[in-house]
Amino acid sequence: MNEELTFEEEMMRLEEIVNTLEKGNLRLEESFNLFKEGVEISKRLEKRLSEVEGKITLLINENEEIDFKEEEKDV
């Protein structure tokens, strides 16, 4: 897939893959290809989540620094 999908779209695709694989009515090669696609999607989703987690951590840390500096001014 060359187009950039949203996080939610990739989650939906991963759910489709899981549901299809759980049915168990595919040939081995088809199952393998779907499994491979699912692993690739999972890696991209994990990377996106890690990036967002890092941004959240930065925002929290920046906010704590601001709060701490404001407390110092009050003293």
UniProtKB/Swiss-Prot annotation:
Family, per entry: Belongs to the XseB family.
Top-level class of the enzyme under EC nomenclature: hydrolase
Annotated GO MF terms: exodeoxyribonuclease VII activity
Known function: Bidirectionally degrades single-stranded DNA into large acid-insoluble oligonucleotides, which are then degraded further into small acid-soluble oligonucleotides.
GO biological process: DNA catabolic process
Primary localization class, coarse: cytoplasm
Matches recorded under InterPro entries: Exonuc_VII_S, Exonuc_VII_ssu_sf
Keyword Nuclease on entry: yes
Subcellular location: Cytoplasm
Quaternary assembly: Heterooligomer composed of large and small subunits.
GO cellular component assignments: cytosol; exodeoxyribonuclease VII complex
UniProt keyword terms in alphabetical order: Cytoplasm, Exonuclease, Hydrolase, Nuclease
Annotated source species: Thermoanaerobacter pseudethanolicus (strain ATCC 33223 / 39E)
NCBIfam families (UniProt xref): xseB
The protein's name: Exodeoxyribonuclease 7 small subunit
Reaction(s) catalysed by this chain's protein: Exonucleolytic cleavage in either 5'- to 3'- or 3'- to 5'-direction to yield nucleoside 5'-phosphates
EC number: 3.1.11.6
